[in-house]
């Protein structure tokens, strides 16, 4: 909620300039010292993505507006956010959830296209 910090986070992500005007933001990070070793190492991304989505759902349930902005895998962006937050090298910011009060009700875009749904195998191909 520190305004200088929110402004610095906004500067680190050109697509999220609105962060500077928000009441708060939550930075979701992966701790590489706790990540699975070996072939499952990258599961930290899924763990953090699930946490990010849960934050969005909780904010919505509380009547708040929330936006998921990305950091990782954009090295420059995640590195800059790490500097702003003084994170150790073992902590990688995956996302920033910017939270505030909605200005009004927005209508969801209808992007449903039944032609893009596959059943059993991709594209309705025969097995």
What is each PLM-predicted segment?
Residues 1-127:
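Acidic, surface-exposed loops and disordered segments
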């Amino acid at each position: 909620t520190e305004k200088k910090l929110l402004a610095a986070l906004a500067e680190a992500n050109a697509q999220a300039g609105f962060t500077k005007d928000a009441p708060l933001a939550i930075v979701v990070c992966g701790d590489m010292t706790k990540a699975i070793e070996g072939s499952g190492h990258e599961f930290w991304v899924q763990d953090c993505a699930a946490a990010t989505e849960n934050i969005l759902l909780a904010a919505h349930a509380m009547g708040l507006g929330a936006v998921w902005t990305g950091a990782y895998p954009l090295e420059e962006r995640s590195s800059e956010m790490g500097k702003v937050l003084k994170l150790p090298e073992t902590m990688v910011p995956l996302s920033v959830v910017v939270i505030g009060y909605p200005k009004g009700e927005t209508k969801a875009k209808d992007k449903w296209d039944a032609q893009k749904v596959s059943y059993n195998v991709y594209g309705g191909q025969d097995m």
